């Protein structure tokens, strides 16, 4: 089986239900995930080391994790509702916040200060640097059309062609994972295995006939 590295979102942890859901959807894959340090400089350093050590076949990041995943060059990657504007996303969350999932370090709450928001705002300036044509073919973005938190489809699409809207909100629920994420994983898997499945593109006009 293949190895997938999962990069969690803000106020989450490696104990996120998303990890369990992905494992159930892909029983033959090995899933690796770790708690990300709160400060972005420490976060990216840890994730880069982890990617080098684990050598995953695929990296999947959601929300804040999608922002980090864009920076992990040299791997096939899927970003789900990536929070490239973390400073803006966090600015409505100042004060004490609780982690939604247990962390290994036992910390269960976080103070979101102006300083921390500035750290993220400065850090996200690094996104979209030095993108090669090869990288453009290795990064897929999935974007919920009803996401109340993050609106980064256009920003992503300026840099990467493989931007895919889906019907859903911010969280990666199993229905979205099954209908949108799994097919993309399958495309990547086929590409890695040197297989091409026949893909039929059906134009809306082809369906829009006297029956509709």
Task: Enumerate the predicted regions with their spans.
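Gly/Ala-rich beta-loop-alpha elbow adjacent to hydrolase catalytic centers
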Residues: 60-70
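Alpha-helical substrate-recognition element adjacent to the catalytic core
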Residues: 199-212
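Active-site catalytic motif of lipid deacylating hydrolases and related acyltransferases
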Residues: 1-53
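Glycosyltransferases and closely related glycan-assembly transferases
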Residues: 70-76
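Short hydrophobic segments within beta-strands
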Residues: 6-10, 60, 142-144, 202-203
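The alpha/beta-hydrolase serine catalytic core
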Residues: 76-196
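Local beta-strand N-terminus motif with an aromatic residue
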Residues: 1, 56, 138, 197-198
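Residue in the alpha/beta-hydrolase core beta-strand immediately N-terminal to the catalytic nucleophile
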Residues: 57-60, 76-78
């Amino acid at each position: 089986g293949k190895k997938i590295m999962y990069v969690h979102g803000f106020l989450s942890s490696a104990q996120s239900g998303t990890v369990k859901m992905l494992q159930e959807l892909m029983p033959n894959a090995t899933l690796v995930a770790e708690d990300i340090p709160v400060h972005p400089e420490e976060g990216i350093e840890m994730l880069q080391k982890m990617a080098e050590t684990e050598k995953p076949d695929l990296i999947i990041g959601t929300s804040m994790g999608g922002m980090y995943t864009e920076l992990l060059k040299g791997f096939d990657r899927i970003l789900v509702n990536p929070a490239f504007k973390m400073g803006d996303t966090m600015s409505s969350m100042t004060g004490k916040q609780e982690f939604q999932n247990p962390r290994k370090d036992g910390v269960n709450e976080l103070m979101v200060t102006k300083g921390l928001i500035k750290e993220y705002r400065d850090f996200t300036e690094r996104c979209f640097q030095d993108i090669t044509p090869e990288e453009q073919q290795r990064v897929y973005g999935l974007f919920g059309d009803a996401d109340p938190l993050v609106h980064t489809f256009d920003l992503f699409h300026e840099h990467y062609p493989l931007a895919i809207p889906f019907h859903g909100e911010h969280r990666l629920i199993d229905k979205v994972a099954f209908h949108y994420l799994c097919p993309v994983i399958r495309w990547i898997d086929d590409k890695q295995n040197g297989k091409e499945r026949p893909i039929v593109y059906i134009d809306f006009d082809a369906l829009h006939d006297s029956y509709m």
